[in-house]
Design a protein with these regions (language model features):
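Short, structured segments at the rim of ligand-binding sites
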Residues: 1-233
């Protein structure tokens, strides 16, 4: 949907869309329409949805918000490094993402719906495995991300000795688990979320990450920043 909204200036005419199923990642959808509106788009999220072409008006100032979905990685670093405290602040542009982060923190073995925050799947699974455990739901669509993010997360966690079981729309994670150094190189399937979470875990126990450079897609300089924290591995 985001791609269609941003491509709509080049449409030859109006395009009628029919949306099926339950809405997911609603915060990103709303942001897409907002960005387009700031550039002159008349299109709005309505039902039925019609996207019309429009002339682009480039704003003089473009404010790019911080990547909120990276915050769980900071939490994960603090969980595995007892003496590490990071100076982080949470931007508030996506309330649905904030609700999801809070739900992970409060899981206590319960259910966490990540339907509006599927980018949190991998760090959330590691977070729950090392703390109270829980069940991640609402993320069947994560199988169509840069990788099958459910299967990829389970595979990656297993290399660190962390267990998770796949479910129809997510995964079940037992809490109170412990990290172990991977024996084999860690495959990330060129998925930046898998790579960054794997690097955070490896900062505690070590490991060889395949395709670590893909993290630049989301966070340029991530590897340098992680090394600058002075962790032992």
């Amino acid at each position: 949907l985001t791609a269609l909204v941003l491509a709509s200036p080049g449409f030859a005419g109006a395009v009628e869309l029919t949306l099926e199923g339950e809405a997911v990642s609603r915060g990103y959808g709303a942001m897409s329409f907002d960005i387009a509106a700031r550039c002159g788009s008349p299109n709005r999220m309505t039902e039925p949805l019609s996207l019309v072409p429009w002339p682009v008006e480039v704003p003089e100032v473009v404010d790019i918000p911080p990547e909120l979905s990276l915050f769980p990685l900071a939490i994960l670093l603090e969980i595995i490094h007892d003496d590490l405290r990071l100076n982080t602040t949470l931007p508030t542009y996506d309330p649905l993402m904030l609700i999801a982060i809070d739900a992970i923190d409060r899981a206590d073995g319960g259910e966490v719906d990540l339907s509006d925050a599927s980018d949190l799947v991998t760090p959330a699974a590691a977070w729950l495995a090392l703390t109270s455990g829980g069940t991640l739901t609402g993320i069947a669509h994560a199988r169509g991300k840069e990788s099958d993010r459910i299967a990829g997360t389970i595979e990656m966690l297993a290399t660190f000795g962390l267990e998770a079981q796949e479910s129809p729309d997510g995964m079940v994670i037992e809490g109170g688990q412990s990290l172990h150094r991977p024996i084999e190189p860690i495959e990330t399937h060129m998925d930046h979320r898998l790579a960054m979470t794997a690097m955070v875990l490896a900062s505690k126990v070590g490991g060889v990450i395949v395709g670590a450079e893909i993290s630049e897609v989301t966070h340029p300089g991530f590897v340098k920043q992680l090394l600058a924290l002075g962790t032992n591995q």
